[in-house]
Regions:
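Sec-dependent N-terminal signal peptides
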Residues: 4-14
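Cysteine endopeptidase catalytic domains of the caspase/legumain-like
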Residues: 16-243
Length: 243
């Protein structure tokens, strides 16, 4: 009987541990840069649609858009999440807006360097951090030393999935209602990327689906896009969503 109670107790502890794990997501999108010549159409939609998906997964989400998505606000929100997240939690950062070599552009038109982003995220106790960047030239994050992304048993392990390569523009489309990358990201998270049909979406499955979808939709156009994945191989099997 004691052995039975011990087994039940262990199962309850495991169940509680699984339930206690959280995913914190900060979603930032800039449509309005204060200039009609550079304003974007779908970035706020990108954020809102992703937020709906993440909330359905019971993620703890924070959403900042347009003028609120300035450099200082993004930093403050990220730092708050970094302080909250525990080792078994996950952190997700998503940005949709303009980009340039080495970083992305918040609403105040300042420059948010990818190295600065990594420096903030490296302070997290959470073991796994995921960044999804839908911005021009976002693949330029590859210029950051691989030592910044977690090697071997070093934590946190940081993943970047970007909409385009370092020398490519990222596009949005009124026909799909989102950026090409974010549209594929949304479809993938909702189940289209579940190659082995186990009702779970891993990072590797998600990237493979996004890459094929985006390349297919932009192939032959003036601005082809080739999404990039930069992360330790050990992260590719991590489950991001279930459906």
């Amino acid at each position: 009987m004691k052995k039975l109670f011990a087994i039940i107790g262990m199962l309850m502890l495991v169940a509680f541990s699984i339930q206690a794990q959280k995913t914190y997501a900060l979603l930032a999108g800039v449509s309005n840069y204060g200039d009609p010549n550079i304003n974007l159409s779908n970035t706020t939609k990108d954020v809102k649609r992703l937020n709906t998906i993440f909330k359905s997964q019971e993620f703890v989400t924070a959403m900042i858009t347009s003028q609120n998505a300035n450099h200082d606000n993004i930093v403050k929100k990220l730092q708050a999440i970094v302080r909250l997240a525990k080792p078994d939690d996950k952190i997700i950062f998503f940005f949709s807006g303009h980009g340039s070599p080495g970083g992305f552009v918040p609403s105040d038109r300042s420059f948010f360097n990818y190295q600065e982003l990594v420096d903030i995220l490296k302070k997290a106790k959470a073991k796994n951090v995921f960044c999804f960047i839908d911005a021009c030239m976002s693949g330029s994050v590859k210029t950051i030393s691989a030592n910044n992304f977690g090697i071997g048993n070093n934590y946190p392990r940081i993943c970047f999935m970007t909409s385009s390569d370092a020398n490519e523009l990222s596009r949005e489309s009124s026909l799909v209602g989102n950026g090409f990358f974010t549209k594929a990201l949304i479809k993938g998270l909702k189940g289209m990327s579940d190659k082995n049909t186990d009702k779970s979406i891993t990072l590797g499955e998600l990237y493979n689906y996004i890459y094929k979808d985006v390349v297919h939709r932009t192939s032959g156009s003036q601005n082809e896009m080739h999404p990039q994945l930069l992360c330790p191989d050990s992260m590719k099997g991590i489950v991001l969503t279930k459906f």
